[in-house]
Every structure is written in C-alpha cells, then in structure tokens.
C-alpha cells in the first residue's frame, strides 16, 4: 500500500530528508508529493516503518493510500468522528490547574500574614 502527502503537510521537508529512496518530490507550487514509482514503503529495508510517516511532525501529513475507496472513506469518517466525540477537557484542566495554584498562593499569603 502506497503513501501520500495530504493537505496537513506543513512543508517542513523532513520527510524528503528521511526517505531512503528519494521518493518525496516537491512540485513547482511547493507542494510535496510521493513518486509511487520510487516509493517502496520502506519494505525490505532496515526501517520497520515507512520513514515519511515516522518523520512527519504532523498527525496526518503522510498517510497510507487505501486500496479501496470505501476503506479510505470509512477511515476518514472514523477519524473525524473520533475527533468530534472526544471529550474536550482543555478548559477543565486549565481551571483545575489555575485553582490549585491560586489556592496555594492564598495559603502562602495567609501564612505570611499570620506569621507576622
């Protein structure tokens, strides 16, 4: 199964530097793409995983090209649904951290006042 570079690519060129076969190319418009004729998916090499995927700093910058349309459709669907249904606890974590630090500061300040 081949790999492709998606719109999530940030053009950091890390994939092209780690590709052992030089299959990562840059188009005239600056977009990166993988030459399928050169890409070996790092099979039969010292690498256990495709290096373009392993070296990519983005989550979905380099992905497998599904062999079947519906396989790709459902993979994308499941990925999007997982993101949408995942509990967004950023603000809850922020508030807990903030309130803990604030409580520590109040206790420290009260200790200084009572200690004087």
Swiss-Prot record:
Gene3D superfamilies, A to Z: 3.30.70.20
Molecular function in Gene Ontology: 4 iron, 4 sulfur cluster binding; metal ion binding
Start and end residues of each 4Fe-4S ferredoxin-type domain: 2-29
Keyword presence, Iron: yes
A Pfam family recorded for this sequence: Fer4
Keyword Transport: yes
Family annotation (InterPro entries): 4Fe4S_Fe-S-bd (IPR017896), 4Fe4S_Fe_S_CS (IPR017900)
This protein's name: Ferredoxin-like protein in nif region
Natural source organism: Trichormus variabilis (strain ATCC 29413 / PCC 7937)
Organism lineage: Bacteria, Bacillati, Cyanobacteriota, Cyanophyceae, Nostocales
